[in-house]
């Protein structure tokens, strides 16, 4: 999360950063001849998809990326919306659980969807569950050669596709939580196109399918009947393209 256009990072849970003057550090490293611009990574990725990818030519789009964490970029009337304090699109911190029993999130709060469906938390849960003394007998473990630490979300997705009970149950828990966050955003923003991407979703097609099905049930029909749901197209190039174009527009 950025505090200001100078690039002060308020909180980057997956990097362990709080109140880091990244813009100043970057400017010092680049020198005075190279202007430094700092953008939220998912905003840059979303803008890259708007300029040259899955949201190209669409004036109202929501791009959601589920990787190590979860974030979104909001495009409205052809413009990137970053909000009054640059926090627009922080969909990973939409609450899907409450109370002391809710999962802790790196942002310092509890119950955020990222604390359940973010890739780092999913990987940790898989390892913890399958390494437990009374671990479920899951095909996902066999797919990874029997090593709980080697089991990836891709293995779990494949196991679920093959009918594995534990994998189906776990995905059946995560998909509705992601759908709550997506459905709330779709109801609030009414995008024409929803772009889905990120390292986790791109490798777990069944989880993506289940989340989309749950989303269509969770959001109002008036908001979804014309909604196009597509996969991100640009991969790792999206952020570079988006940041370059945003920097060009900032000068």
Predicted features and spans:
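Active-site and channel-lining beta-strand-loop segments
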Residues: 1-3, 70-76, 80
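Short beta-strand segments
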Residues: 39, 63-69, 73-75, 95, ...
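Structural signature of FAD isoalloxazine-binding scaffolds in flavoprotein oxidoreductases
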Residues: 87-92
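Adenylate-forming
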Residues: 45-51, 72-74, 93-95
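Glycine/small-residue-rich loop that forms an oxyanion/phosphate-binding "nest" at active or ligand-binding sites
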Residues: 37-43
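A charged helix-plus-loop insertion that forms the helical arch/lid used to bind
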Residues: 7-18
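ATP-binding/phosphotransfer module of carbohydrate and carboxylate kinases, centering on a glycine-rich
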Residues: 3-6, 24-36, 48-60, 80, ...
């Amino acid at each position: 999360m950025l505090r200001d256009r100078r690039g002060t990072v308020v909180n980057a849970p997956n990097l362990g950063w709080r109140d880091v003057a990244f813009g100043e550090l970057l400017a010092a490293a680049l020198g005075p001849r190279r202007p430094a611009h700092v953008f939220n990574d998912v905003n840059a990725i979303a803008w890259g998809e708007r300029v040259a990818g899955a949201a190209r030519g669409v004036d109202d789009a929501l791009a959601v990326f589920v990787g190590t964490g979860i974030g979104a970029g909001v495009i409205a009337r052809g413009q990137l919306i970053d909000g009054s304090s640059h926090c627009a699109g922080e969909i990973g911190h939409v609450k899907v659980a409450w109370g002391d029993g809710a999962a802790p999130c790196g942002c310092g709060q509890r119950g955020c969807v990222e604390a359940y469906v973010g890739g780092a938390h999913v990987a940790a849960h898989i390892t913890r569950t399958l390494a437990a003394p009374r671990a479920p007998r899951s095909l996902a473990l066999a797919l990874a050669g029997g090593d709980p630490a080697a089991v990836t979300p891709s293995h779990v997705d494949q196991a679920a596709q093959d009918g594995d009970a534990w994998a189906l149950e776990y995905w059946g828990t995560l998909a509705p939580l992601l759908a709550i966050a997506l459905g709330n955003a779709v109801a609030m923003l009414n995008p024409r196109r929803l772009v889905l991407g990120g390292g986790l979703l791109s490798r777990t097609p069944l989880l993506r399918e289940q989340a989309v099905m749950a989303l269509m049930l969770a959001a109002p029909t008036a908001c979804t009947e014309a909604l196009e749901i597509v996969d991100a197209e640009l991969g790792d190039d999206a952020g570079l393209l988006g940041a370059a174009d945003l920097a060009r527009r900032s000068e």
